[in-house]
């Protein structure tokens, strides 16, 4: 929805898109060019100790450009979309007050949407007893219940992520209303420019596969073992993303070899990326930049014009 006030709202460039498309690198380049700071919009990078598996920016990159909303909570804790929304708005406004330019960068659709569209997220506190009951149910039963209570959320939710499914059910059961009906859109807080990097599908898959190989070489397995030693359960790892899920299953003996685990992980990320692309393609506000050598200069020119108010 468009509002006449858009012209006077603070301007917020937003870099979105699928995994391994180059969002973080482009965000850093733009922040350097326009005296900016970066707010992460990644639902897994909020967790401490999950660095390799989430492709978190390095300490050297953080030293170059301030990054916000990384390492917010421990992996065993819950961090809701509502908590993210409140924290991100606070950080963005602080950056603006200091005369710097905020850039929102990430690939988690719900995090991005709650800032770009300023959704009113239902403020339902975690219900430990209800969650414990739901966690005892098989995934198929949870999905069937969500389909009955909230068909719209059922159609769009990550069906391999029990944590998100349980949260949606939690809101439905506590409020008596579908989760999707409670995400009202308020007036926007920022005038946003949404950019994404577009790669041919086969090249994007090659980038994904190369990233998986790099993560394994950098110590991804050791990172998962460290999380287990810190008390993060295998069940929790299942909900923390594909990399942690597949390595956990291999360590438990559910996958016979490391080579098989890596190959299955790559295929799973390909599938996840297809769903990411479907979600982002639906948003016609996103401007897609062809990946390649000319992309960075094109992005800089677009952001320059956008920030100038033209």
Task: Report residues per predicted region.
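Phosphate/pyrophosphate-binding catalytic cores of soluble transferases and nucleic-acid-acting enzymes
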Residues: 1-310
